[in-house]
C-alpha cells in the first residue's frame, strides 16, 4: 500500500491498492524479476572473467571505472526473459525473493570499494545540481546510479554487524537521461508506525515535512527497489552493500521528497549561518518551534534533560572526583527510574534505551545533534529554513502508574516555567545545552550567545502556543486512526473497511498499539496549564 502526506493543512491523500486484485500479475512480475537475476548472474560471470583479465593487465584506474560503468549498463539494460523457471523456483513466494537476491548478488560485477559508478559527465552534472528533481511517484528503479548514506552515525561506523537494529536514511539518485536526475530519500525504521504518526502531527502543525509515501515488502515495487539497491550498493562498497542487505529485510520503507543544497547541523558554519546578516533570528525561532514539538513526542530525548540540578552537580564533580560522580549517577537512576542523568561521565545526552530508532532532535553521537533536520541557506515557499527528514515518538506507553511519570511532567513544568517567567533571560536548560555544544561537540555559537538562546526560547514559546491551539485528545486519537488505516485497508462487498491479515499488517498493528494516547494527552495538559498561567500573567 502507499500513502502520501501532502504539505497542505489537514489534507492527507491516501492511495490504496486492492490487495485482492492482480494477484496473477504480481506473481508473474516476481517470476520475471527472479529470471532477470538469473540472467544477470550468467552475464556477470563473464564480466568477472573480463575483470580478472583487466587486473592481470594492470589497467589504469580510469579504465577500470569505465569498465564497471559499462557492466552497470549491462546489468540495468539486460532484458527480462519469460518466466520459464524450474518447479523449485516457481514454488518460491515473494516473501523469499530477497533471499534469492542476496544469494545471487555476489555474481554481479564489483571492483573493490568504488565510490561512484557514474560516468564523469554524470558526476559533474550532479555536482552542479543541473536538472535535479525530486519525484517520489514515477520512479524507475532500474535508473538508480548512486546511493549515499545521510546517517552520519552509520556512515562513520565501520561495524556493520548491528545495522539491522539501526534505521537508515539514504539519498538515492536516478539518471533519466539528458542530464535529468531524480533524487529521493529512502528511510527504513524499526518504528515506522510511530514515525509516520509523528509526521502526520507535524503536517497538522505546518512543519516542513516532505511529501512522502510508504511501501511495504508485499508490493511489487519493494522487490524492484531491493534488487536495484543491492546491485548499486555492491558496485559502490562492501560496507554499503551489507547495510542495504540488512535494511531491506524490514517490512516498510518511506520514500520522501528531497530538496538538495542542505547541510546537517554538524556541517554548518554556525556563527555565519545564525548571524543577523543571514536571518539568524528567524532561523533560531524556527528551531525553537521544532524543539517544542519534542516536549510532547520525545520527552525523554530533548532539551528538558538539561534541567536537573543533580546533573549539574555530577558534571561539576566529574572534574574533581569521578567516583562521586558515578555514585550520583546511580542514585539518580534509582530514584528517578528514568534515564535523565545517565552516562554523565561520558557527557552523553540521555536517551530512552528501550527504543532503537533515530532520535528526533538529539542523538547519543556528539556529531548528530539535530540529526533529523537538514539546514538550508534559503527558505522554502512557506518560509522554513529547515527540512525534517526523520520524525518519531518516544515514551509512548507511559502512564501515571509507571516509574518516572511524575518526573517527566516535572521536567516539562520546570523548562516552561523558566522560559515563560523570564523570556528575555537565558534559561538554565538552554545554558547547559549551549555549553554542551561548545565543550563536547566543538560547536561554538555566535558571540552574542544570550541573543542566540533567547531566540531559541522565543521559538519554543511560539511553538507551545501553536501546539495548544492545534492539538487535543481528539486530534491524537483521529491521527492514530488515520495511520492505522493507511495500509492494508480494503473494502468488502458491503463497503466496510477490512484489514488484510498478513505478517506486515500484524507488524503495523503492533506499532499502532504502542501509541498510547492518554500519556500524550497528559503531557499536552501540563503544557496547556503552564501556557495558561503564562497568558494570565501577561494580561495583568
From Swiss-Prot:
Cross-referenced InterPro entries: Actin-fragmin_kin_cat_dom, Kinase-like_dom_sf, PI3/4_kinase_cat_sf, Put_AFK
GO molecular function, one term: kinase activity
Chain segments annotated as transmembrane: none
Residue stretches in coiled coil: 27-68
Domain of life per record: Eukaryota
Stretches the record annotates as Disordered: 37-70, 317-341
Keyword Ribonucleoprotein found: no
Key word Transferase present: yes
Keywords assigned by UniProt, alphabetized: Coiled coil, Kinase, Transferase
Family as reported in the entry's similarity comment: Belongs to the protein kinase superfamily. AFK Ser/Thr protein kinase family.
Protein's UniProt name: Putative actin-fragmin kinase DDB_G0287957
Organism listed in the record: Dictyostelium discoideum (Social amoeba)
Species classification: Eukaryota, Amoebozoa, Evosea, Eumycetozoa, Dictyostelia
Amino acid at each position: 500500500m502507499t500513502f502520501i502526506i501532502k504539505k497542505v493543512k489537514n489534507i492527507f491523500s491516501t492511495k490504496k491498492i486492492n490487495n485482492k486484485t492482480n494477484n496473477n500479475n504480481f506473481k508473474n512480475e516476481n517470476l520475471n524479476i527472479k529470471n532477470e537475476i538469473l540472467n544477470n548472474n550468467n552475464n556477470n560471470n563473464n564480466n568477472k572473467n573480463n575483470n580478472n583479465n583487466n587486473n592481470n593487465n594492470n589497467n589504469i584506474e580510469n579504465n577500470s571505472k569505465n569498465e564497471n560503468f559499462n557492466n552497470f549498463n549491462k546489468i540495468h539494460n539486460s532484458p527480462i526473459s519469460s518466466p520459464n523457471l524450474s518447479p523449485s523456483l516457481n514454488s518460491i513466494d515473494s516473501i523469499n525473493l530477497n533471499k534469492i537476491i542476496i544469494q545471487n548478488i555476489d555474481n554481479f560485477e564489483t571492483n573493490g570499494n568504488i565510490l561512484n559508478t557514474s560516468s564523469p559527465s554524470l558526476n559533474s552534472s550532479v555536482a552542479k545540481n543541473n536538472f535535479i528533481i525530486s519525484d517520489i511517484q514515477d520512479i524507475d528503479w532500474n535508473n538508480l546510479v548512486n546511493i549515499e548514506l545521510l546517517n552520519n552515525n552509520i556512515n562513520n561506523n565501520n561495524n556493520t554487524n548491528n545495522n539491522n537494529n539501526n534505521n537508515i536514511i539514504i539519498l538515492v539518485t536516478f539518471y533519466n537521461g539528458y542530464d535529468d536526475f531524480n533524487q529521493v530519500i529512502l528511510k527504513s525504521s524499526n518504528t515506522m508506525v510511530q514515525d509516520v504518526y509523528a509526521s502526520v502531527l507535524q503536517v497538522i502543525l505546518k512543519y516542513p515535512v516532505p511529501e512522502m509515501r510508504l511501501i511495504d515488502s508485499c508490493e511489487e515495487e519493494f522487490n524492484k527497489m531491493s534488487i536495484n539497491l543491492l546491485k548499486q550498493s555492491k558496485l559502490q562498497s562492501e560496507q554499503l552493500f551489507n547495510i542495504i542487505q540488512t535494511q531491506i529485510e524490514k517490512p516498510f520503507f518511506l520514500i520522501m521528497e528531497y530538496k538538495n543544497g542542505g547541510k546537517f547541523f554538524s556541517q554548518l558554519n554556525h556563527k555565519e549561518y545564525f548571524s543577523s546578516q543571514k536571518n539568524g533570528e528567524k532561523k533560531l525561532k524556527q528551531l525553537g518551534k521544532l524543539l517544542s514539538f519534542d516536549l510532547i513526542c520525545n520527552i525523554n530525548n530533548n532539551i528538558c534533560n538539561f534541567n536537573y540540578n543533580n546533573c549539574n552537580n555530577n558534571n561539576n564533580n566529574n572534574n574533581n572526583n569521578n567516583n562521586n560522580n558515578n555514585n550520583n549517577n546511580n542514585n539518580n537512576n534509582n530514584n528517578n527510574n528514568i534515564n535523565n542523568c545517565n552516562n554523565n561521565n561520558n557527557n552523553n545526552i540521555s536517551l530512552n534505551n528501550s527504543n532503537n530508532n533515530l532520535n528526533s532532535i538529539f542523538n547519543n553521537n556528539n556529531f548528530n545533534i539535530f540529526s533529523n533536520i537538514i539546514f538550508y541557506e534559503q527558505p522554502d515557499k512557506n518560509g522554513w529554513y529547515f527540512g525534517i527528514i526523520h520524525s518519531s515518538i518516544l515514551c509512548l506507553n507511559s502512564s501515571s502508574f509507571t516509574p518516572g511519570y511524575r518526573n517527566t511532567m516535572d521536567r516539562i513544568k520546570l523548562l516552561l516555567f523558566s522560559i515563560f517567567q523570564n523570556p528575555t533571560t537565558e534559561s538554565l536548560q538552554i545554558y547547559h545545552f549551549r555549553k554542551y555544544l561548545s565543550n563536547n561537540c566543538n560547536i561554538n555559537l555566535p558571540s552574542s550567545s544570550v541573543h542566540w538562546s533567547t531566540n531559541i526560547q522565543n521559538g519554543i514559546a511560539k511553538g507551545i502556543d501553536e501546539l495548544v491551539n492545534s492539538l487535543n485528545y481528539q486530534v491524537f486519537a483521529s491521527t492514530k486512526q488515520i495511520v492505522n488505516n493507511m495500509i492494508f485497508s480494503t473494502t468488502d462487498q458491503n463497503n466496510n473497511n477490512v484489514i488484510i491479515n498478513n505478517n506486515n499488517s500484524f507488524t503495523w498493528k503492533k506499532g499502532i498499539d504502542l501509541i498510547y494516547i492518554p500519556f500524550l494527552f497528559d503531557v499536552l495538559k501540563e503544557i496547556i496549564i503552564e501556557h495558561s498561567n503564562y497568558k494570565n500573567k501577561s494580561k495583568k
